[in-house]
Amino acid sequence: MEKSARQLSVAEQNGESGRLNNGYTSNNIQQYKDETNRHQFEYNQNRNQLLRSIHIIQNLLNELDNYVDRSDCLFHSVWRTDKEKSKFSGNYYPFSPSKMNVITIDLSLRSSSTADEKLISQLGEEAHESLLKVHIEKANKHLFSLFSRVEDTSSKILITGDLNAGKSTLCNALVHKDILPEDQQPCTEVFCEVHDAELNDGKDCVHAIPHGLTYSHTDSSTYKVFPIEDLKRLVYETENWSMLIVYVNDGRPAHESLLHNGITDIALIDAPGLNTDSMKTTSVFACQEEIDVVVFVVNAENHFTLSATDFLRNASTEKSHIFIIVNKFDNIRDKERCKRLILEQIHTLSPGTFADAKDLVHFVSCRVARDPNNREDALYSSFFQMENSLRSFILENRSKSKLAPVRRYLSGLVGDILNICEYNIKLIDFDINHLQQRLTDLSPKFRKVKHEQQFTYQKNESLVEATVQSISQHTHSELEDAIDSLGSFASVKYSGFFFAYQYAISVRDAMQQYLEEKLLESEDYARKRTEEAVLCIQKDVKDNFDSAVLPVFHANQMFIKKHRLQLQKHFRFELGLLDFIDLDLTERLGTWSASLSTILLVLGKTTPSFTTLGAFTGNLGYPIFKYFQNNSLQHLLVPVLGLASICVFGYVIYDIPRALPLKVAEKIKKSLRETDFCHNASIWIGTESRKVLNIPLNDLRRMFHQQWDKQRETISVAENDLRICQKARKFFGEIESRTREAKKKIMMVQLEGCDINY
């Protein structure tokens, strides 16, 4: 920046004629106004751009803060010192986070920083997310302070220094009024903030702020008003007031006045002298965001004391440039040596200040400058050079004093946000590639395995159906044949008429036993076929599941006696007399007719002629006829009936071995067929076999479904993880893009002489 408007003094003007107050000519004033307007336009542009950038970055931080609160949040910490392992693949990521500038972890145990870093690396995901939220909260608070600072058009100048260094004298000289007490002993014990009286309707007065209250000019309850003359008394009343707000009119034109400059509102803050009690408070006050410029007053006779050294070292962490005024320089005889020693100390304490020492370090005497009779003294001109440099540093270089720290912080913060986004994008892309490849491998494999297992299950299901059908058909056929053959059953020996009833019981029991044996044979057949099918199913189970534990099949435990009990009820009947008699002679007569025809055919070849037979009949028949002729039919009826009864009874007794089994068999057949015993027994045995076969079949199906469910769950988890990664990738990608745009806008803020060190 040009020096013409920045360092105007009496010694630098050409001639005495045409000079105005303090050596300013009309040309100099117009040049000052033009250059001031240009700087004000540039300042407003940069200021507005930084305000917009702060708002954008706050939105980005709030979105990050909301994101880590989500249940599907995927955040990779940037504070790890070792490589992170992927929770999706189990492999270590081939990336490491970049160094952070602003969002850093401040470890208090400096001696064991390595151990602390390892401890931070071992924290879980939730802890790192909480750390990010804490840093976001801190950054938002700082951004809010920076926003207030940039938005505020006023500038605050803190004037501090060692005890009795001349701070109050400097303030009086800068406002060209004797308002603060001056003494060789420490005077100011309360912070005094000096403003232009225009901010108080042009009235010179003091607003004393009691302890515990926050000052507001529009709220009269937050302060007490005193006349300006009472200020020299109020500065000693530390027990009553926390701060004194002073409104004063220095009566100078805008191009000369520091407070009434026509560009921005400036406040001079006169701080108590540094000592053991006040140094810490003043250092903290100097580091606050609302302090734009720190003016440090040094007693030329004492140089930098220990308290001054500590203060400058602390304040330099926030303010890279400090305006230093070496007062009482008129008391020094070897001025060059004094300058050299003080500049060497400044070089060590504040390198930024030393680099601009021509503009920021001034050797003056406030006592000499306040006496107009000392115009010819070089120290008189030096004071006005210092005043112009201070005006230039505050007004023309407000970008350096007010905007540069904001731009520097914003640049570092967007760099950290970009580091977070870029690091997370790299790791998320790594996981997305792994999950996509995993799904590419899993889906076809799952479909193929499922198709093969479905075929295996259907094959075994068909085997079960075929086995059950075969068992049912075999049982039905065997029982039907057995029932049909009951009539020809002759395994029981007949012991005579007197044992006919026992014979009937034995025949009935034998038929029951015979049918039960057929049932047992059918059960044995069902066991055999069922065992074969079970072993076949278990073989498929073992082929598909090597680690499956198969139960031992016990075929002898199949079936219960229920169907045999059903059979027994068909044999629980009483034997009657008719069960021993077969009155149906049709079949019997048919047999006799065939036998008689055969006999006559044989006898016909040997029978005598009819003549011979007739002679025989005539000789024998006549006596018989003669007998019946002499005896009536009434006398013959009883003998004939008796003979017939004897014949019938004899026939019945003779026919019991044949008739009884037939009658019992018919009764059993009728009972069995009425209840459809064969069908029910075949269904029962088939059902029991199906129950047994369904056990390994259901086990096979269950194992298949469990495997399918597990594979589907694996695929579903991978798909869900992929969706989470893709959402996170989209989120960080959008944040990264918007952050880069914000960074471009921040970099467009060009501040003269201010470089970004991040």
Swiss-Prot record:
Catalyzed reactions per annotation: GTP + H2O = GDP + phosphate + H(+)
The ranges of region (Disordered) come to: 1-25
Which stretches face the Cytoplasmic side? 1-595, 657-758
Where does it reside?
Mitochondrion outer membrane
SUPFAM superfamilies named among the record's database cross-references: P-loop containing nucleoside triphosphate hydrolases
Q: Where is the stretch described as G4 motif? A: 327-330
Region G5 motif: which residues?
364-367
Renumbered to this chain, region (G1 motif) spans 161-168
- What residues form the membrane-spanning segments? 596-616, 636-656
**Which Cys residues form disulphide pairs?**
none
Tell me the segments the record calls region G3 motif. Answer: 270-273
A GO CC term attached to the entry: mitochondrial outer membrane
What are the EC numbers? Answer: 3.6.5.-
Record domain Dynamin-type G: where: 151-426
Please provide the Gene Ontology terms (biological process) for this protein. mitochondrial fusion; mitochondrion localization
Q: Which domain of life is it from?
A: Eukaryota
Q: How does this chain sit within the bilayer?
A: Multi-pass membrane protein
UniProt-annotated stretches for the region G2 motif: 187-191
What are the protein's GO molecular function terms? GTP binding; GTPase activity; GTPase motor activity
Q: What does this protein do?
A: Probable transmembrane GTPase, which mediates mitochondrial fusion. Fusion of mitochondria occurs in many cell types and constitutes an important step in mitochondrial morphology, which is balanced between fusion and fission.
The Swiss-Prot or TrEMBL record describes its family as follows: Belongs to the TRAFAC class dynamin-like GTPase superfamily. Dynamin/Fzo/YdjA family. Mitofusin subfamily.
Entry protein name: Transmembrane GTPase fzo1
